């Protein structure tokens, strides 16, 4: 790949990634279900971020997820109940930076026929895990008489599990019905096309 072609590919990836981050951010404003101390069901808002990695690889996926994390902090930041410096650091890292940058790991499955379907449940569950750890480390003060781990599991699961299921279901539909170009995959050449090029 020459320099000009590489530059065009990078520009294309930048534009597409920016549009997908913007789409995810817009979808995150659709909140049919919102919890009192952060967390809400935002249908399919994670899917565009997953698509960045699927279309352009790990580097772009992680970068897109990181930028999306910053936008989420700007949109609605939930300060820790303790108000300590350590609490703020934990919230910023676990509930935002790690939770959303993780979605870019979808880039590990780039080029696979059902890459999105594999990435969707794995990456979204990893986000759930990040919030789960945050619930134990930071938000456990709200657990009252409930075990902290169970409180975090149920609280974060109440919005993350519906999101995981919905995102995975739509990913399955896309993998089955969408053309390869959606996933930045070349359509396999037909037999007669292969024979023509070999002559």
State the predicted function of each range:
Residues 1-60:
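Hydrophobic transmembrane alpha-helices
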Residues 27-41, 67-107, 139-143:
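Interfacial aromatic-anchored transmembrane helix boundaries in multi-pass membrane proteins
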Residues 111-129, 186-199:
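Internal alpha-helical transmembrane segments of multi-pass membrane proteins
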